[in-house]
Amino acid sequence: MLIDCHTHDTTRTDAIISVSPALFRPEEGKHYSVGIHPWETGATPYFELLERAAAHPSVAAIGETGVDRLRGADIDTQTDVFRRHIALSESLRKPLILHVVKALDIILAVKKECRPAMPWIWHGFRGNVTMAKQLADNGILLSLGSHFNTDAAASIPADKLLVETDESTAGINETAARIAACRHISLPEVIALASENLQRAVAYTV
């Protein structure tokens, strides 16, 4: 079974459900990621809520977090909140899920500075082949949703590929099938790759 790396559909049991700390209401049999979205970085007073939620055993990852140059608080504030998520990810030994818009330079600079031990997952990756290589070379996993660059999808190293739905109505297997076509491999092969990569990243039992 293919586990959805990132969704906002709280009814799912075959996915990592992304929620804000204020809305975190864990249910048995479900797995979550919790974080302060870059668009909400003006709300840093509830970081204490995040710290409490993140420690819950049903939380598989921290985020989504990152930097968005088109929306949210000023870049310095977003970067500061991003750094706090990194520290939390490292202290709890849970991977980090990234939301990044036109801020590749900041993300890579902070990663180089912080030297994190935990995996980073770039959710909803839509970049080109060059960007995919740059991120993969820096150890970042790339999660593809319903919109992606087909050449990039074909080029992502096998050990860096993940699949998600985010807020799309497209099913996870539908997206995986399109990725398989780009890579000229079978759907079961994509499912196996993505499942293994996610399991390794989050110690998640598929």
Question: What kind of feature is each model-predicted range?
Answer:
Residues 1-206:
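Mid-domain alpha/beta scaffold segments of enzyme catalytic cores
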